[in-house]
Design a protein with these regions (language model features):
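A glycine/serine/threonine-rich, flexible loop-to-helix segment
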Residues: 50-51, 115, 192, 204-230, ...
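Amphipathic alpha-helical dimer-interface segment in Rossmann-like NAD(P)H-dependent oxidoreductases
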Residues: 105, 127-149, 163, 187-188
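Short-chain dehydrogenase/reductase
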Residues: 1-95, 105-116, 297, 301
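Catalytic loop of short-chain dehydrogenase/reductase
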Residues: 106-110, 118-124, 128, 154-192, ...
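A short helix-coil junction within the Rossmann-fold of NAD(P)-dependent oxidoreductases
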Residues: 92-94, 107-112, 142-151, 250
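Active-site loop of short-chain dehydrogenase/reductase
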Residues: 9, 67-68, 95-97, 146-161, ...
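C-terminal helical subdomain
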Residues: 199, 219-301
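Rossmann-fold scaffold of SDR-type NAD(P)-dependent oxidoreductases
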Residues: 14, 97-109, 132, 157-159, ...
Length: 301
């Protein structure tokens, strides 16, 4: 494969501040893309998540990786801000947008893992849906016309899990499942216009928040397996990023449009590895160590 297969391409990574979004943005940069990184957490104004990561840091990492990173603060729940973001991309890049990645989430502090629906705070749950689903709809509504006009492009909806298996919390499950349906519906409507849309999930992702929770860093992450043995089978955000970069560089990606994909189902086809040279396969680990306790992972949607 070419070393910079996305040179000259323009991408928008919505929710690129941290975690999978950051990993995707950086790996698109490695592949040579110009990457607009958007989100609420900026050096000039933080979000209510209270984390240190910023869109400017991600853009700098894109630059360091060999791409061009451009940070634009935008709340993707605000249609006016998203419209302005897309208008800027259109003006800057002569109407070009080749890759749209929607990794907006922000639902961690709103997810209730302890209670069934009828005991949950309704306002909190609906806020989660607005952050995790409505933001994706708003972003696509304004970004898709750029792709349709050029009759090419790829939409990537980032989710958690790619099967019908229940994800452990009502609103969390509803949000992550809805993102898969967003990809499916967009694929159906975009196919006549030459634009592909798909969903993708990582396995056990070593996000900044997970590393903090386990008291480790990316450098000594294996020590986290002392607290959670399954963490030994985790994957870095770069692994997800390399999967998305491979999809974006695939001239036959339309064949995957409408599907819910996973990192573990793509590394064999595209040959990418994680940063340590391994190829984590969460589905295989589930089958080996988790199926007896939790049941089958299920077939991809």
């Amino acid at each position: 494969m070419e070393k910079r297969p996305l040179a000259g391409k323009v991408a928008l990574v919505a929710g690129g501040t941290r975690g999978g979004g950051r990993g995707i943005a950086v790996q698109l940069g490695v592949a040579g893309a110009t990457v607009y990184v958007s989100g609420r957490s900026s050096g000039s104004a933080g979000s209510d998540l209270g984390r240190a990561e910023t869109i400017e840091e991600t853009a700098a990492l894109v630059d360091a990786a060999g791409g061009t990173g451009i940070a634009v603060r935008a709340d993707h729940g605000d249609p006016d801000q998203v419209r302005a973001l897309v208008d800027r991309i259109a003006a800057d890049r002569d109407g070009r947008l080749d890759v749209l990645v929607d990794s907006v989430w922000g639902g961690d502090p709103l997810t209730d893992w302890e209670h069934p629906l009828w005991e949950q705070d309704l306002d909190r749950g609906l806020r989660l849906l607005r952050r995790a689903v409505e933001t994706h709809v708003i972003t696509s509504r304004f970004a898709l016309p750029l792709m349709v006009a050029r009759e090419s492009g790829l939409v990537v909806e980032v989710t958690d899990g790619n099967t019908a298996r229940y994800r452990g919390s009502f609103f969390y499950d509803l949000a992550k499942s809805a993102v898969i349906r967003l990809a499916f519906a967009q694929a159906a409507e975009l196919r006549p216009h030459g634009v592909a849309a798909l969903a993708i999930t990582p396995g056990f992702l070593r996000s900044e928040a997970v590393l903090d929770h386990l008291g480790v860093t990316e450098e000594n992450w294996r020590d986290g397996a002392v607290k959670d043995p399954h963490f030994a089978y985790s994957e870095s955000p770069a692994y997800l990023g390399r999967a998305v970069a491979a999809l974006a560089a695939d001239p036959d990606v339309m064949a995957k449009s409408g599907r819910a994909l996973a990192t573990w189902g793509l590394y064999g086809e595209y040959g990418f590895t994680d940063v340590d040279g391994t190829q984590p396969d969460f589905a295989a680990h589930w089958a080996d160590a988790l199926v007896d306790e939790y049941g089958p992972l299920g077939d991809p949607l």
